[in-house]
């Protein structure tokens, strides 16, 4: 199953500052780029950055995104 926007994911890339940390998927690019998943973290790194791009195989889904409530009419 593909990773969706809003999912909580754990980073499995060992050289990453956020290795084994949990972040939220901000966006998923479907154009075919090498690192299509943008993940946002609560913790900032040494350069005051809190987002990074990852491949899907470098991430482990911890919690699926909550379904949006349908608007009542």
Curated annotation (Swiss-Prot):
Stabilizes the interaction between PsaC and the PSI core, assists the docking of the ferredoxin to PSI and interacts with ferredoxin-NADP oxidoreductase. It comes from Synechococcus sp. (strain JA-3-3Ab). Keywords: Membrane, Photosynthesis, Photosystem I, Thylakoid. Its main location: membrane. NCBIfam families: PRK02749.1. Pfam families: PSI_PsaE. It is a peripheral membrane protein. This is Photosystem I reaction center subunit IV. Transmembrane segments: none annotated. It is found in: Cellular thylakoid membrane. GO terms for cellular component: photosystem I reaction center; plasma membrane-derived thylakoid membrane. The lineage of its organism: Bacteria, Bacillati, Cyanobacteriota, Cyanophyceae, Synechococcales. The keyword Thylakoid applies. Belongs to the PsaE family. The gene is psaE. GO terms for biological process: photosynthesis. The keyword Membrane applies. Gene3D superfamilies: 2.30.30.50. InterPro entries: Elect_transpt_acc-like_dom_sf, PSI_PsaE.
